[in-house]
Amino acid sequence: MSRSIKKGPFIDLHLLKKVEKAIETGDKKPIRTWSRRSTIFPRMIGLTVAVHNGRQHIPIFISDEMVGHKLGEFAPTRTYRGHSVDKKIKKHY
């Protein structure tokens, strides 16, 4: 058994309070959070969480397959635009 299993899942307290409040009121607005390190709990299924990626908040609808993963896994922080092409290539016929 690895140490991380013994420690158990983690969720920020302020995010947990926001989730509980959204469940009580039945609010369907996205919950904005900067806590990418928080684990997705079963009580969060059906909610929309807007996770910050460093530039903007990305809305993520929580489904049952996501339970146990971290919120940051679903909001990529880096954009890959591809390698630049060499414009000096001449075609030889």
From Swiss-Prot:
Asked if the record carries the keyword Ribonucleoprotein, the reply is yes
Query: Which InterPro entries did the record assign?
Result: Ribosomal_uS19, Ribosomal_uS19_bac-type, Ribosomal_uS19_CS, Ribosomal_uS19_SF
Biological process according to GO: ribosomal small subunit assembly; translation
Q: Which Gene3D superfamilies match?
A: 30s Ribosomal Protein S19, Chain A (3.30.860.10)
For whether the record's keyword set contains Ribonucleoprotein, the answer is yes
By sequence similarity, the record places it as follows: Belongs to the universal ribosomal protein uS19 family.
Name of the featured protein: Small ribosomal subunit protein uS19
Give the species. Blochmanniella pennsylvanica (strain BPEN)
- Gene assigned in the entry: rpsS
